[in-house]
């Protein structure tokens, strides 16, 4: 990306590391928000009382409830154990996406290195879950149900799985780059008034992309666990 970024004023950091700085800053920001939300949550009866207005605690509660419902629908009865993973991915991707709506800020998720890294994390995790719950049987499913077709099914399955983190990363980086480029162009041409609908579109795209990434991660976990049924 060749547009202006406030990080370029940090002379100790080369421009091609801007996405790393943004990702680290977002991670630290989410960590601080999480601690603050935990303090807001309190304990005992206070902890189960819903927040009366929009707050940091309310945001995390909304995300957790939404991801819990999604995990229950996708994975089933034990979907709750994967809520922390999916909610963390959703929050990290969402906040990174939203940062790009601020002038002079470049989201880490429009860089393929970052989005591919998140995809690789999902890839490693769901394969770990498959091996944890099925052991050697998880590897056997790559051969297909018919042994004499294993020579054909194995490369297809391996290629399909190998492309999952890449497609996750490309989808996220491509959509965020395109959306924020459109917002940036219209903001430069018409700095007042007209860019507002495009900012709204950017907000929607940011939400959808974070949701899709979390959803596909849960789907891959479900598929990895499905072979023992």
Please provide the spans of the model-predicted regions.
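Selective transmembrane helix interface/packing segments
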Residues: 1-229
């Amino acid at each position: 990306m060749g547009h202006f970024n406030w990080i370029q004023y940090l002379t100790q950091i080369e421009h091609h590391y801007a996405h790393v700085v943004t990702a680290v800053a977002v991670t630290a920001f989410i960590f601080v928000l999480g601690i603050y939300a935990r303090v807001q949550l309190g304990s005992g009866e206070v902890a189960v009382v819903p927040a009366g207005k929009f707050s940091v605690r309310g945001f995390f509660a909304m995300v957790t409830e939404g991801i819990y419902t999604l995990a229950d629908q996708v994975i089933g009865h034990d979907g709750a154990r994967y809520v922390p993973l999916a909610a963390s991915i959703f929050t990290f991707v969402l906040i990174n996406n939203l940062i790009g709506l601020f002038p002079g800020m470049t989201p880490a998720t429009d860089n393929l290195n970052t989005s591919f890294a998140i995809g690789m994390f999902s890839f490693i995790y769901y394969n770990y879950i498959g091996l944890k719950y099925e052991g050697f049987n998880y590897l056997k499913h790559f051969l297909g149900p018919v042994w004499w077709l294993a020579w054909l099914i194995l490369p297809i399955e391996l290629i399909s799985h190998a492309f999952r983190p890449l497609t996750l990363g490309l989808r996220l980086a491509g959509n965020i780059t395109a959306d924020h480029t459109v917002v940036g162009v219209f903001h430069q041409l018409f700095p007042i008034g007209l860019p507002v609908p495009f900012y709204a579109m950017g907000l929607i795209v940011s939400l959808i992309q974070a949701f899709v990434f979390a959803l596909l991660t849960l789907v891959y976990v479900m598929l990895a666990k499905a072979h023992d049924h």
